[in-house]
Design a protein with these regions (language model features):
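Short loop/turn hinge sites at secondary-structure boundaries
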Residues: 40-43, 64, 68, 72, ...
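Membrane-engaging insertion elements
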Residues: 19-34, 46-68
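Non-Sec secretion/translocation targeting segments of pathogen effectors
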Residues: 1-37, 41-43, 350
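N-terminal leader/targeting signatures
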Residues: 12, 36-37, 88, 190, ...
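Compositionally biased, intrinsically disordered low-complexity segments
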Residues: 14, 19, 25, 36, ...
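Tandem repeat scaffolds
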Residues: 136-350
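N-terminal capping/linker segments that flank leucine-rich repeat
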Residues: 5, 87-153, 335-350
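Short linear elements at protein peripheries
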Residues: 50-103
Length: 350
């Protein structure tokens, strides 16, 4: 079946104007009754052909951008041409001398016939940057370039040892990605999804991880000094041996996290929840845990010298062989067992 110009124009518009999973599904689904019939009797043959064409568009665009730009941060060309796409020419005209509109004009032509569409410049630029990012770090191109929220789709990407210093990763989906040993110093990861990702040995100092999802991620030996984890989700996260000096974890959810061997000197964990968290041989000198929920958390051989647990929830919290010199516990809620423990073993230090 020969693809119509309108169909190819619509496909290009979906790929480079939206770039989401929903847009891909809509663009590659059968459109006419005939296509639905053929798709049915070929067990999805029409959709498979459309998906292959969609992926070819993306791969060709990535190659074209890479060959026409000196680096990923350079301005996009005003005119981008993809030749021989199913026998057609696909042209993208960005706003400039040849395009006074504020939109990107997509023109698909073959012989004397052509079809045009318009797509938002902001979306087009964002998608092109995703293609270039994937190209630079040797990540295979994916037909889904953006998340439904407009962040980069880098799910499952292999970025071991990658230098992502000061990179803008806001809203990026990096779930199940491998970032072992990667450098994300001062990276902006606001709202990013790192669920199940490997961040062992990664450098995240001074990074912005506000509202990021790090649930079930592995961060053994990572550096998070002065990182902003306000409101982040760190449930079931492994933070073994992490350096989190002066880290801001206010309001973070760290339930069931393993923070053993971590350094949290002067970390601000006010209002955080660490229910059933395991904290063994950690250094939390001067840490701020005011209003934190530490219910059923286990502190073993941990240094809490000068820590502030005022108004914290200490119901059924375990403290064993800990240093609690100058610990503040004003208005903290304690279960009878925890109160007895403090009265019998730590009363002179508080």
């Amino acid at each position: 079946m020969q693809r119509s110009l309108g169909s190819l124009a619509g496909m290009a518009t979906s790929a480079f104007g939206a770039g989401t999973s929903a847009a891909m599904r809509q663009a590659t689904s059968p459109k006419t009754i005939l296509e639905y019939i053929i798709n049915f009797f070929t067990c999805g043959g029409v959709r498979r052909k459309n998906e292959a064409q969609y992926q070819e568009l993306i791969d060709t665009m990535a190659d074209t951008l890479k060959s026409s730009m000196p680096d990923r941060g350079a301005p996009l060309p005003e005119n981008i041409i993809l030749d021989d796409m199913d026998g057609c020419r696909v042209e993208f005209n960005l706003p400039g001398e040849n395009n006074e509109a504020e939109q990107v004009i997509v023109r698909v032509s073959k012989g004397d016939h052509s079809e045009t569409r318009e797509i938002p410049l902001v979306s087009f630029e964002k998608i092109c940057r995703v293609l270039l990012f994937r190209y630079e770090f040797s990540i295979p191109q994916d037909s889904v370039m953006l998340t439904a929220q407009g962040g980069m789709n880098l799910k499952g990407a292999v970025l071991t040892g990658a230098n992502l210093t000061a990179e803008n990763l806001c809203g990026t989906d990096l779930s199940d990605a491998d970032l072992g040993g990667a450098v994300l110093f001062m990276a902006d990861c606001d709202g990013a999804n790192f669920k199940g990702a490997n961040l062992s040995g990664a450098s995240l100092g001074d990074s912005n991880l506000m509202n990021a999802c790090l649930e079930h991620s592995i961060m053994c030996g990572a550096t998070l000094d002065r990182a902003n984890l306000t409101g982040a989700n760190l449930q079931y996260t492994s933070l073994l041996g992490c350096s989190m000096v002066e880290c801001l974890c206010s309001g973070a959810n760290m339930d069931h996290a393993n923070i053993s061997g971590a350094t949290l000197i002067r970390a601000d964990m006010s209002g955080a929840t660490l229910q059933s968290a395991t904290i063994m041989a950690a250094d939390m000198e001067g840490a701020i845990l005011t209003r934190a929920n530490l219910r059923k958390a286990s502190f073993i051989s941990t240094n809490l010298d000068g820590a502030d647990l005022a108004e914290a929830n200490l119901n059924n919290t375990c403290f064993k062989d800990c240093t609690l010199t100058d610990l503040r516990t004003e208005d903290a809620r304690m279960s009878t067992s925890t109160q007895t423990l403090f009265n019998e073993f730590y009363s002179e230090n508080i």
